Amino acid sequence: MDRGSLLPFQLWCPRPFSKYSQNQPRPPSTALKPPVCPDTSSGTEPDHRPAHLESTPPAVAAEAPTSQPAPLLSTAASGDEGRVLLDTWYVIKPGNTKEKVAFFVAHQCGGSSRASSMKVKGHWGSDSSKAKRRRRCLEPTKAPPDQGGREGTPATEVTPTSSGDDVDLVSVAEMVALVEQRAALALQSYPRPSTPAPVVFVSADQGGPAKGLGSERRSGGGDCSRVAEAVAHFEAQRDSPPTKGLRKEERPGPGPGEVRIAFRISNVREPHSPDGNLPNGGGGRPGCAYPGSPGPGTRAKDKITCDLYQLISPSRDALPSNVEFLLARADEASEGETPAPTRPEDTPPAPPPPPARDCGASGFHVDVVVTGVVDACIFFGKDGTKNVKEETVCLTVSPEEPPPPGQLFFLQSRGPEGPPEPPPADIPSTVPGPDDSEGTTDTSLCRLYRHVSHDFLEIRFKIQRLLEPRQYMLLLPEHVLVKIFSFLPTRALAALKCTCHHFKGIIEAFGVRATDSRWSRDPLYRDDPCKQCRKRYEKGDVSLCRWHPKPYHHDLPYGRSYWMCCRRADRETPGCRLGLHDNNWVLPCNGVGGGRAGREEGR
């Protein structure tokens, strides 16, 4: 009896039925490979399966050449290729665990040359439906590019085995673990052109490798560090809108609606290595390269849009009278390169800026700028950034006039009680030459972190001091506070008394009375209780009156009792009406006769 006639689908199970010889690989037609598994024609089981099954090996597989180029995923554990079939396609029921394993293996091994020979046959049930996910990932028009950039390269290094030898069976977990191990090793050796993984690059010595803080460096990179060494990260390159001068797969930028923190926003030209090549195949900044950035021929100019700069000065030509943008340049390199000016608008190179001046006490070096739209967020160290043009905001404000409210945190504190600010001239003076030793890289990274953190915390503290409410009332003397409180109504005094213990003590000690208070001050009636809530006046009482307008009702001696106005079921419940205390039990001075005369006049 044929095995395929019993079940509408076939499951791949490596144990305990037999070995891998029951499932044959399907090599692509463009790049033929030798059979990975023993040939079933020479085994113990005859080949009586139908021809439409995917486990049937093609007839041309035996004549494939055995010499193959270097593998992509077989960088480690080369002796296990006979055991683990990474290039095998099986007929698996959709939704099964083995289908996910097959997808994982297909994504790791499948290149542009494999998609043409893959076929999906619907033999999984009466509905004859295809695996949509498999059909989508193996579509010839959307085939993923080869990781190494080479076409026709086999995914595994095949070691043909004899048909009579027994092959050790491997479980699904072992196969997945080995595939993940090989994929990790392959990704380290062969970085993809467009990597969506978050990577941050920190500039180091030009021409020298950057030493990380304990993490490994990429084998194909130049002066770059991993995520654990940096402070921020680059987002996925496909989520941001196209940048002028960068293709879609090359631009690094933030996601939509994201706020970045850009440290020392600057722009420099390409570095000239001694051999004429750029490290890591990228251009634009010394010791900094993007994954998939253009080659040495094309220089990627990053557009940096700073909301803070645009808020203060939309253009450099029309500046306010009290704001100046000074360009603090670092020392020029030996080649005599001139740094390209960084502007809020991405425009062609402008005429050379005015020479930098020393800001003195009124200058503040902006190292940390909170931005809303930043197309590139780059961290520059103090080692390889000689051709860096930095901007220093200098505010000229006379000491007799008050500082503008929106620019207070740019001003340097004149008093001794303010926190000290770093002078703007300390950055170029601490830049070492490119011929220094590699031991300064770690110290420069630590110095960069400390410098950036200090500036960020200092600016945040100044912004918080700007935005927080000024508590001037706590500094006023008590007699001034009593005079102020005497002009406040009952609700305002009650709020102040419940808010601050200092205000509560002053109100109760001095007996502050509200402007709308109805307590009778007459010595004959001041001890009378409130006619609504029956509360007596106490010194400093600015509370609100709560009462029930209708009397308390009790149905039965043991039954339910309630207030007749609001149907509340307890006698001690607070009143449903809220107002002011009133202990005036006597009618106004005109008395009843005055009211009667008024009614008679009205007739």
Curated annotation (Swiss-Prot):
Start and end residues of each F-box domain: 470-522
Domain of life: Eukaryota
Purpose: Substrate-recognition component of the SCF(FBXO46) protein ligase complex, which mediates the ubiquitination and degradation of target proteins. In absence of stress, the SCF(FBXO46) complex catalyzes ubiquitination and degradation of MTOR-phosphorylated FBXO31.
Subunit structure: Part of a SCF (SKP1-cullin-F-box) protein ligase complex SCF(FBXO46) composed of CUL1, SKP1, RBX1 and FBXO46.
GO BP annotations, alphabetical order: SCF-dependent proteasomal ubiquitin-dependent protein catabolic process
Region (Disordered): 18-54, 113-165, 235-301, 332-359, 412-442
Protein's name according to its UniProt entry: F-box only protein 46
Pfam families the record matches: F-box-like
GO molecular function: ubiquitin-like ligase-substrate adaptor activity
Entry annotated with the keyword Phosphoprotein: yes
Gene: Fbxo46
Organism field: Mus musculus (Mouse)
Compositionally biased spans, kind Pro residues: 347-356, 417-426
Phosphothreonine modified-residue sites: T347
Pathway: Protein modification; protein ubiquitination
InterPro entries in the record: F-box-like_dom_sf, F-box_dom, FBXO34/46
Origin organism lineage: Eukaryota, Metazoa, Chordata, Craniata, Vertebrata
